[in-house]
Amino acid sequence: SSLPDGGAKTAFLFEPGNSPSRARMLRAVKSKLPQANFYTHDPLDLGIHVRAATKAFGKPKPVRPRFHFDKAKVILSLDCDFIGSEDDAHRHIRDFTKGRKLNGGNPEMSRLYVVEALMTQTGANADHRLRSKLSDVYGFAGAIAGRVGVDGFSDGGISDVKWVEKCVEDLKKAGKGALVVAGHRQPMAVHVLAHAMNQTLGSLGETIELLPADDLGVPVAGSLAELKSAIGGVDTLVMLGGNPVYDAPSDLGWSEVQGKVKTVVRLAYREDESAEGCHLHLPKAHYLESW
């Protein structure tokens, strides 16, 4: 029923990913339904890293930062559990471990500074850990950025000046071997500050590089929140995986939003909370069926 209008009242909701096969299929769908809109949903908003890097460096197309912890001499983590809950943690563990081993080719260990609210795996491995409220991380980031040389930032009433000064001293000493990272729970402003420090220290192209963001195959109109705002103009919703009724923020009230759509089609592994409000549920092949 959506074909005559080019899919103007059709929306697709899917999980972020880097599958070239899926990207190819989505492009094929877009060619058949040029007016359809595509949205993504991930209960953990790891996309902040892409959005922040793209904004901080003024790139015309989305880019994602790749961190080289094996090359870093001094690391500052701003509420970033990079060897625990962050994206690419498996690679970060391997690279970070290389920098912590003392051998003939690496006579010095890397040094890790961590500002965080809750104890994390990364914090447990820190040489210098500062416990802070989540809301205060930006203040510490600004104080460090100002001392490193980023314009327009000062102390902002921080409590532990000595800790900050020692961190800044080591970051400046490391220069291009320094690396500042921000976690996915932190707002855009903290991520932009982290990238500003990396650029000021000369780390860009050394301990951090910018790569093209994962190709989703089609332009993305937004996240679940944007889809909620546009739901009045949607007659057909196609859900490719995910379980937003279960894991979306409660203030979105996604179960009620989904119930407003005339036709909901879902491809997923099992009949779960989101399946209850669907008109058609299609079984998704798991990895043993699709390899």
Tell me the role of every PLM-derived stretch.
Residues 1-291:
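Cofactor-pocket helix-loop regions in the catalytic cores of large enzyme subunits
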